């Protein structure tokens, strides 16, 4: 066990496009989507110990410890590996909850990667991803750490290299539950599957966007505002919307115009997760 206190990034993701191709008998939706990381991150400071307990600080308002994906991921890893070690995890929360940028899933993946290293379990990323998918369909993308085209229910990943553009994100003052979007009777569920090359060359679309804009006027308002300046879309099932730019200056210029009552961020697209880089840095330090 490595007892050193370590600090780990937990990055957000964007769905650059999202198409829903059908629905399985178990209720899960078949989809095609393109994931890319952005350099907007929560951070987790983790200290492993021999207590066997998983403790978190600070509490997240409205979220019980046993419902927190950070605690769930650590406990799941303990149980799977029969590890008797524990950890104290401090959370620096930047990513908005209910935003469609993968905050909870990313936190879970960061815990799996970090504790696998700190507890010296030596589990493969495939094993960690298989554990992670029990916590959420997006967790494997954060475990593997590369931008990817995803199919199936999101578990079939193919590495991809979309342009690493600059983005302006706005988080409307609503929190959207994924289940509410995917169970909406008017959701498009029959977009024909297409080869990746065709999807990459087409105009990017999110099949959830029409429903979300109709049900949540605040999302519609913010997305309409962004569309005045650049190509813009919903990410995931929302509520975050984003506009894409070729340069940081273009993004900064539009970001400076965001209304005072809106919560916004500037971020850079990343095809390799910063979590991967941090893990490699800690591995190198341990060899010295």
Swiss-Prot record:
Coiled coil: none
Membrane-spanning parts: none
Residues binding ATP, per UniProt: 96-106
Record GO terms (molecular function): 4-(cytidine 5'-diphospho)-2-C-methyl-D-erythritol kinase activity; ATP binding
GO biological process per UniProt: isopentenyl diphosphate biosynthetic process, methylerythritol 4-phosphate pathway; terpenoid biosynthetic process
Family: Belongs to the GHMP kinase family. IspE subfamily.
Database matches in NCBIfam families: ispE (TIGR00154)
Protein name stated in the entry: 4-diphosphocytidyl-2-C-methyl-D-erythritol kinase
Organism, scientific name: Aliivibrio fischeri (strain MJ11) (Vibrio fischeri)
Gene: ispE
């Amino acid at each position: 066990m490595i007892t050193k206190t370590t600090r780990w990034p937990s990055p957000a993701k964007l769905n650059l496009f999202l198409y829903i191709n059908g629905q399985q008998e178990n209720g899960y939706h078949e989809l095609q989507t393109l994931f890319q990381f952005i350099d907007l991150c929560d951070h987790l400071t983790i200290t492993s110990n021999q207590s066997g307990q998983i403790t978190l600080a600070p509490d997240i308002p409205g979220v019980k410890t046993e419902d927190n994906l950070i605690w769930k991921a650590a406990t799941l890893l303990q149980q799977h590996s029969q590890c008797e070690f524990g950890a104290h995890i401090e959370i620096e929360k930047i990513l908005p909850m209910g935003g469609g940028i993968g905050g909870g899933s990313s936190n879970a993946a960061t815990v799996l990667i970090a504790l696998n290293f700190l507890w010296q379990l030596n589990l493969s990323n495939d094993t960690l991803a298989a554990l992670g998918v029990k916590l959420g369909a997006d967790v494997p993308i954060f475990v593997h750490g590369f931008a990817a085209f995803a199919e199936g229910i999101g578990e079939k990943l193919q590495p991809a290299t979309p342009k690493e553009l600059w983005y302006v994100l706005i988080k409307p003052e609503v929190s959207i539950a994924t289940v509410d979007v995917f169970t909406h009777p008017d959701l498009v569920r029959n977009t024909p599957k297409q080869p990746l090359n065709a999807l990459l060359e087409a105009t990017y679309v999110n099949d959830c966007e029409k429903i979300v804009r109709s049900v949540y006027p605040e999302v519609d308002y913010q997305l309409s505002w962004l569309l005045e300046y650049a190509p813009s879309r919903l990410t995931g099932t929302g509520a975050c919307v984003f506009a894409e730019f070729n340069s940081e200056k273009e993004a900064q210029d539009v970001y400076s115009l965001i209304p005072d009552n809106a919560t916004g961020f500037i971020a850079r697209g990343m095809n390799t997760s910063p979590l991967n880089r941090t893990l490699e840095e800690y591995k190198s330090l341990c060899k010295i």
